[in-house]
């Protein structure tokens, strides 16, 4: 299991887009920060992205190196409740994250998930 905390999806995506554009215009050595971060993650690994915002914000990460991706986030706005209740509703609590990880890699049990 790997964990990547992204503080600015916008800047990370802008760097990736700039590197792609540079390669298209003849700079094959251009590599973005996110490409360096994900370069050592085997292609058979899957990514689960989680954001307290729209899931499309991080869904592009699977395209960087070609990983299967399950993006979790808030798809409908206007609900009220406690943070814990809302996170559970949208599947961005611990139980939802583990369920998404289990679903994207079927047959590979997640150890120590019984605490949920």
Model-identified regions with their sequence ranges:
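Thiamine diphosphate
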Residues: 1-116
